[in-house]
A protein has these predicted regions:
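Glycine-rich nucleophile elbow surrounding the catalytic serine of serine-hydrolase chemistry
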Residues: 132-137
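Cys-dependent protein tyrosine phosphatase-like superfamily
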Residues: 22-124, 139-185
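Bacterial N-terminal signal peptides that target proteins for export
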Residues: 1-11
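Intrinsic disorder/low-complexity segments
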Residues: 3, 21-22
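Histidine-centered catalytic micro-motifs
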Residues: 126-130
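Bacterial N-terminal signal peptides
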Residues: 10-20
Length: 185
């Protein structure tokens, strides 16, 4: 079996493992209901990931109360400037590194990794449309920056929502694998 096929098989195994999570794997993070945020998941004290901000009026104060210092938007889009204004008005930093699901351009990943690795930004909330890009980007950070194995980072990403619950999830898994394999130290 070649390296790419082995990696795909390992990631598929990780997805299956995440689907039958044990109590010990539940310590990886915690899904929390945050008003105005779709699929909020607290990874640890420095980072949370999630899907779209569905209500700025509810989400921004809730994120502020949770101590979030920086919001990283991986979706971008038409609402990004209004979201930026609300986040910055609340005294938080707002960064956009839009990753397009059609073009799959990896260019936003390097600046994302820099921002997501900067303790001055912590705690950070990383979000995208459904949370898949956020979990995928965090998986890349865990492997490329933190030195985790793909398998360990994949389990965490699957727990955070990078699962086959929509058509884009397999695309993001492949995007993460390709980026990791071309940037792994």
């Amino acid at each position: 079996m070649n390296r790419a096929a082995s990696t795909r098989a390992a990631v598929l195994f990780v997805v299956v493992l995440a689907g039958v999570a044990t109590p010990s794997s539940a310590q990886l993070g915690q899904r929390i209901t945050v008003p105005g945020v779709n699929n909020f998941w607290r990874v640890d004290k420095t980072v949370s990931t999630g899907g779209s901000i569905t209500s700025r009026e509810m989400a921004v104060p809730a994120l502020k109360r949770r101590g979030i210092r920086t919001v990283i938007d991986l979706a971008g889009g038409a609402d990004a400037e209004r979201e930026r204004a609300a986040v910055e008005a609340a005294g938080m930093k707002y960064l956009v590194f839009a990753i397009n699901g059609t073009t799959l351009d990896p260019a936003p990943i390097d600046p994302f990794l820099k921002a997501a690795s900067d303790p001055a930004n912590y705690p950070v909330f990383i979000h995208s449309g459904a949370g898949h890009r956020a979990a995928m980007a965090w998986m890349i950070k865990r492997v490329v920056v933190d030195g985790w194995t793909i398998e360990k980072a994949g389990i965490e990403a699957a727990s955070a929502g990078l699962i086959d619950d929509n058509a884009m999830a397999p695309v993001w898994w492949k995007f993460a694998q390709d980026y990791i394999m071309s940037h792994k130290k």
